Amino acid sequence: MTDSQDKVNGGSKNTFLSRVFGVHSSAVENSLDAAEMSHITMPTEQDFSNYAEDEGNVRLIESDQEPSSSNEDSNDEEPLIQQPQSIRFDTASDGMATIQSESEPDEGGTEEDEVHLEEEDFSDQDLASSVSKYGQPSSSEDEEPLSNRDSNRGSDETIPFIGRQRLNLGGKNPITGATKSTKNPSESRVFERLLGNSPAKMFRNNGRPNNLEESFLFRKPSVAEQSGPGKSTHFNLKPPPIFNNISTLTSTSKNSLSSLSPKERALWKWANIENLDTFLQQVYEYYLGNGFYCIITEKVIHLATILFVVFISTYMGHCIDYSRLSSSHTFEEIHIEQCYKTQISPTAKVFLWIFYAFIGLKVLQLYFDVKALKDIRNFYNYLLSISDKDLQTIPWQSVIQQLVLLKDQNAITANATEVKAKNRLSAHDVANRIMRKENFVIALYDNNILDLSLPVPLLRTCALTKTLEWNINLCILGFAFNEKGYLKQAFLRESQREYLGEELKKRFVLAGFLNIILSPFLVTYFVLLNFFRYFNEYKTSPGSIGSRQYTPIAEWKFREYNELYHIFQKRMRLSMIIADNYVNQFPNTLLSLTLSFIQFVSGSFVAILGILTIFDPDNFLNFEITPDRTVLFYMTVFGTLWAVCHSSINDEYTVLKPEETLEELVSYTHYAPKEWKGKYHTEDIKNEFCRLYNLRITLLLRELVSIIITPFILWFSLPKNSERIIDFFRECTVYEEGLGYVCKYAMFEATKIDKGTKAKKQTKRMFSQAEQDDSETESDEGVNKMLQSYMYFVDDYKNAGNAVGKNQLPASPIEPSYHPYSSTKDYSWKTQFALGKNSNRKRNLNRSRVKRFPDRSSDLELGSLSGSLINKSTLFKDDIADNADELKAGNGVMGLLNQYYKKSDRNR
């Protein structure tokens, strides 16, 4: 084992494991040299035999199935969902990033034609200039002699540099999916129209150093870890250690974990992951929660908040004698002794005991959460070399880098069986696993699948609220995904469409009845919670009643595919400054006049009552103007009303430049419908934006009303969309090797948008020509959203200015911009979400510019498989043997109540 480590660390041998996991070099301290960790690669034709199919011709998730036998490897049936080509994002030395693609070579191709499939041997000196390897062989038998590869490299050097195929994120053009040889002028014109006739500006580094291009996504250490002026904060993270006893630990039984040290236990957990999605979600939630003690404190405070609201409301409602309040002078005079026995009714006692049982279950759940959090803490501390105190400032990119390094460094200790486990670990794959469900939700709202209106004249357009959103996620996602977090196979079968639609309708109706039963308690809790939370804020600063925030539907519209929550949340918070500036530029004279009159009247009453109080301050304050309403009460009411009106009147002079301000705002929200083009200065666009960026007090009232009307939406509106929702999952699902079934838009491959599943083509035949045109328009919108998400995803992980903590902003100075629409305010955080340094340069990414792309079904190309340290024998098997049992699981009353309990403290 020591010899093998020396060979790998020395970087002098290109062994089998180095071909699978990348060459390790001591000069870069075993940095990210594994191609499978940094981009989506392509397999050889031998990998086609690894596809698994069930009896219904539906492919199993590779990470969830048993090792296939030699007989099963010969199965060459076509899968349900075909594999399209992947994206390649190249970066040249001049700072210009290009998009390239590769076609699968023909069997009769020459060696020169297939040179791009060969692996390149490289070192640290020529890493930046050499062509990276495209794929990883699946076994040592595929290893090619070094002499042959030298000849291949020589033939490659004869090709002009500008014509070479260069490696980056994927392999296929995300716009057309075409190879370089099939590119034609019409496709170039489509690409130019998409990027506003200036594609170079979309991908240019705008003067950044050339070494900035070599991020950890592209096989070199992240720039965030390089010191120097103008670069991000330097984090002295130690590379994950190499463990020599991993083979012994992997054979340790689960019952013997108590005898292991925390470090060995963390390594055993890592090597025996049963569900990679759940594990990565726990790692990310631990990062969001800022460590062990912060997460535990947050959970305890959440339980304490619920207890306080219930206790104080029960006590104030049953243990205080309000009839003696005016004539009493001490608390003992109004307090009712033994109020629990004498004042609380038996029905109320039953509900209190149910509440106490709920709290007891939450405390028990907290106990198990503590045990799970300890394992994640050990994983961070011992395997990733990241302490809890660093989580508040360390960027997520560094966590990803440590994850990749952990797998890369300890791969030398894994045996041949373990490295065949098809679990890729890169920034794109990690984001897809963490957001497997969220990506479907983004597409669900972006494609306007749900009908939230009611057949009532005044409630035909019902806005999405947190309560309704929570119920929708519970009904749809809880039904579409199994307990392991994977999409149920029945959703991919056209024959199950009617059955699934009926089951989903029943689920909506059942959820509506549960909301009716719980609505009295939810309304009471919601009113009390928000009263305690916002009363003091509105009392001390009445002007905050006019504050705004984004609506729930706006958040889903603005969020990009594979955009993690902390990145999205920071983007939304930073955009609020510009959003307020945009809204305040539109004066409302009618409202100002009305508020001025109300301010005058309320101020007059306060002045009159105040003057009268001077003559008899002891008695006049308790003088009742109306029954049980004293002077002090009315002075408080009129004073608050005056303060609210005064703060709502905007009498400041502002610079009227709505076009420039909204352009700047769009650079953060990433949302600009084609209907807005050329109308940024109009009142209609401002009102439409205000529906997305509404008053907070309005949203609170909507949430209160939503608790009452949500059951009716679940009964009458959403059941009509059941079959459409089933079609959505079937059409928006693709199979990705090593990941399983994911949302097609999250893979950043335009070929998957057009192809989808076989069921999508069968469904299209049932619609008229006009409906097909509408479908094509929606597909174009989906392609635009996908392309936009791809660009910002690359920028989030490749731009050094974005490698900051969750609550930090880049400290690098802003270079002056000469864009005619640049803002007059020099925000120090503009580079946080900019493509390159020039943050004020607006991206002319209009989502209406992409036209329908030609179908290229013959250009399909598969991504390569990569090895893993994870034991394949411990990966669970997807239990799809009985489709009926899988669909019926959790659909009854108790199953839905169980999901209500599990998700009761999320998004509510």
Swiss-Prot record:
Catalytic activity reads:
a 1,2-diacyl-sn-glycero-3-phosphocholine(in) = a 1,2-diacyl-sn-glycero-3-phosphocholine(out); a 1,2-diacyl-sn-glycero-3-phospho-L-serine(in) = a 1,2-diacyl-sn-glycero-3-phospho-L-serine(out); a 1,2-diacyl-sn-glycero-3-phosphoethanolamine(in) = a 1,2-diacyl-sn-glycero-3-phosphoethanolamine(out); a 1,2-diacyl-sn-glycero-3-phospho-(1D-myo-inositol-3-phosphate)(in) = a 1,2-diacyl-sn-glycero-3-phospho-(1D-myo-inositol-3-phosphate)(out)
**Composition bias, kind Acidic residues: at what positions?**
103-124
What domain of life does the native source organism fall in? Eukaryota
**Keywords assigned:** Autophagy, Cytoplasmic vesicle, Endoplasmic reticulum, Golgi apparatus, Lipid transport, Membrane, Phosphoprotein, Transmembrane, Transmembrane helix, Transport
User: What ranges are annotated Cytoplasmic (topological domains)?
Assistant: 1-299, 371-507, 529-594, 651-696, 718-908
InterPro entries (UniProt xref): Autophagy-rel_prot_9 (IPR007241)
Biological process annotations from GO: autophagy of mitochondrion; lipid transport; piecemeal microautophagy of the nucleus; protein localization to phagophore assembly site; reticulophagy
Cellular-component GO terms for this entry? autophagosome; cytoplasmic vesicle membrane; endoplasmic reticulum membrane; Golgi membrane; phagophore assembly site membrane
Segments carrying the region annotation (Disordered) are 37-188
The set of disulfide-linked cysteines is: none
Kindly provide the PTM information from the record.
Answer: Phosphorylated by ATG1. ATG1 phosphorylation is required for preautophagosome elongation.
Q: Where in the cell is it found?
A: Preautophagosomal structure membrane; Cytoplasmic vesicle membrane; Golgi apparatus membrane; Endoplasmic reticulum membrane
Question: Polar residues composition bias: which ranges?
Answer: 126-139, 176-187
Give the intramembrane regions.
508-528, 697-717
Regions of biased composition (Basic and acidic residues) lie at 146-156
Lumenal face of the membrane: 321-349, 616-629
Question: Where are the bilayer-spanning segments?
Answer: 300-320, 350-370, 595-615, 630-650
Q: How does it sit in the membrane?
A: Multi-pass membrane protein
- Function description: Phospholipid scramblase involved in autophagy and cytoplasm to vacuole transport (Cvt) vesicle formation. Cycles between the preautophagosomal structure/phagophore assembly site (PAS) and the cytoplasmic vesicle pool and supplies membrane for the growing autophagosome. Lipid scramblase activity plays a key role in preautophagosomal structure/phagophore assembly by distributing the phospholipids that arrive through ATG2 from the cytoplasmic to the luminal leaflet of the bilayer, thereby driving autophagosomal membrane expansion. Required for mitophagy.
Subunit and partners = Homotrimer; forms a homotrimer with a central pore that forms a path between the two membrane leaflets.
Its family remark reads:
Belongs to the ATG9 family.
Q: What is known of its domains?
A: Forms a homotrimer with a solvated central pore, which is connected laterally to the cytosol through the cavity within each protomer. Acts as a lipid scramblase that uses its central pore to function: the central pore opens laterally to accommodate lipid headgroups, thereby enabling lipid flipping and redistribution of lipids added to the outer leaflet of ATG9-containing vesicles, thereby enabling growth into autophagosomes.
Q: What protein am I looking at? A: Autophagy-related protein 9
Which species is this UniProt entry from?
Kluyveromyces lactis (strain ATCC 8585 / CBS 2359 / DSM 70799 / NBRC 1267 / NRRL Y-1140 / WM37)
